[in-house]
Amino acid sequence: MSRLVSFASLLAAVNAHGYVQNIVVNGVYYSGWEINTYPYMTDPPVVAAWQIPNSNGPVDVSNGYTTEDIICNLNATNAAGYVEVAAGDKINLQWSAWPDTHHGPVISYLADCGDDCTTVDKTTLEFFKIDAVGLVDDSTVPGTWGDDELIENNNSWMVEIPTSIAPGNYVLRHEIIALHSAGTEGGAQNYPQCFNLKVTGSGTDSPAGTLGTELYNLDDPGILVNIYASLSTYVIPGPTLYSGATSIAQATSAITATGSATSGAGGAAATGSSAATTTAAAASTTATPTTAAAQTAKSASAPSSAATGSVPAAPTTATVSTTTSIATSVGTTLTRTTLATTTTAAAAEPSASAPAPSGNSASGSNPLYAQCGGLNFKGASGCVAGATCKKMNPYYSQCVSA
């Protein structure tokens, strides 16, 4: 019984936050790094997502933002493959369920990795910002943020690869920064995710970048901030937005095929459109196009639209190691405000990898990193074994490691 309790506690901790489960490019679905299964496999599938342990909690920045973990997450190692995209393509990143209390900006970067993203030293990558959405609406405390737009869009986010960048191999760094406890130094929580891309096209720009360990400081105004006070503006942390970045009014798209990441180095990137190797999906999803919310007046950064990205359907795939996680995490048909479950021809059994919603577990004990108190909080105040409820501010208490 103790082993079962321990395992349940572990699952609760793992599902307390989020990670990117898959990406979609031009209707083609590519699996991400499935944290609940791939870390335990001797020969996991080749994906474009960088590899991390079975953890999706925040990066530990208690000693500052110079930790290597801030680059691509905890103990991240290079992805074994890449996905080919054309400059100007839009990439949809599908997160698992994101807690609605973890307000903050959503930011995306690119870094040129030279000849081979699978072997590049991550500490040498220099990132330039291609997308950022911070404070959208400050009419009510704590405000509406980029992550709220992500949640509304079925926990997905869409970003466009700038048309002006030169062809080559790049690492896409996509991140949510949760600010619910950012009123004290070291309280902001970073959740970076990385993917290897081979970008084709005819652009010529090679934007200057910033080392991952130099993107932020503990006292940056967008990192050290009390979101429970009235904010008229918010300075999105990190370097300025690349001048060639495009603010897009997004619409959801249908998944028409499944694709597999290409193993190894990308080699020399060609001009023209990307040509992914795909198989037709047995089922696809459609959604009603939506318009991006106006938000540039609130964020002190270059204009950027709120994402209303595409919603993955459950593609039928012959890859045994990934069918369960795909079916449980992306088998939905969604408009911006409506979620409906679809049924595929070969539905998989429920998986422990299905993300748990934030909040209280059935036992009355909250998982690690979940809210356990605060002004007007009505849920349980207990935490799972090994965790304790810590008061971050009058509005928010959180389960943290004891």
From Swiss-Prot:
Keyword annotations from UniProtKB, A to Z: Carbohydrate metabolism, Cellulose degradation, Copper, Disulfide bond, Glycoprotein, Metal-binding, Monooxygenase, Oxidoreductase, Polysaccharide degradation, Secreted, Signal
Domain CBM1 intervals: 364-400
Cofactor info, note text: Binds 1 copper ion per subunit.
Name of the molecule in the record: AA9 family lytic polysaccharide monooxygenase E
Top EC class, one word: oxidoreductase
UniProt keyword Cytoplasm, yes or no: no
GO biological process: cellulose catabolic process
Binding sites annotated in the UniProt record for O2: H180, Q189
Entry's EC annotation: 1.14.99.56
